[in-house]
Amino acid sequence: MSNELSANWGSVNAACQPLVDALVADAQTLQIEISTLTNGTRIIDAGINCPGSLEAGRRIGEICMGGLGTATLGTNSGFANWPWSVNVHARTPVLSCLGSQYAGWSLSHKDDNGQFFALGSGPGRALAGREELFKELGYKDQADSTVIVLEVDKFPPVEVAEKVAENCGIKAENLTFILTPTASIAGVMQIAIRVLEVAMHKAHELHFPLEKIVDGYGVTPVAPPGGDFMTAMGRTNDAILFGGQVQLFVNASDDEAKALAEKMPSNTSSDYGRPFAEIFKSYDYDFFKVDGMLFSPGKVIVTNVNTGKSFSAGELNQALLNQSFSL
């Protein structure tokens, strides 16, 4: 990607800071809890020691998108049994979805108390620029404070906060961690809001020129929370694999648009056809054995803004969604 496009991108940290402030201000009504680590790093617990809420998850999803996306609730999922849906649109989708929302920062720490591991998402990634992706995007944000979202069911040790603050070039007290357990109601909501990001990541994996993607939106059912991590992880993946719908608007040739549509849907994967929890178990819970092409929306429309032609591929699979959601 040329730096000409990213040169016009604003700060994802500046854009999302008002959303973080509002989340903290409304903590009581959102059923989330605010605390601090010993080094001053702020913790927003959205489901570990508190109930959390769907609205908290919706807001956290917009924070993940760097303040450049909107997530609204509706009943147009396309599934009679699971009408509750989330509609996602991102301004500057490459920056919002890949430069902020994508969970690409691997964070870990091991001590006598055990091991902590999480994949960080949110605008803090663009401050640290630790991933190769940011070299390709030609983007690095600048800010005095930041936020990272972690899909975890326990608090991060202070050492992780120190590492993140150092990598971001900020004081530890200016760092916020938002914690969203996968099995929580806030967790299933913020994962559903990743439906467009999943499509953007797949486009990147398919080596489609990112600068040719000019806009996009997605819709997906919101998975019922699972009672345990494995069930919840399966359901949140399946919501997008079997129920996610995305439309991308591209500035490309018709051949490029058609090829992207045909290659993107989840049913192009050799692992498609079973709930994700079953697939994961069959590979002895080794995530890296799962076909990477599986992680895609169920149905895709690619519209060429030059010619006005649209190309559609994939399917919505109600039977597999019902099986995954335990109906």
How would you label these PLM feature ranges?
Residues 1-164, 168-169, 173-197, 201, ...:
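Anaerobic metallocofactor- and corrinoid-dependent redox/one-carbon enzyme cores
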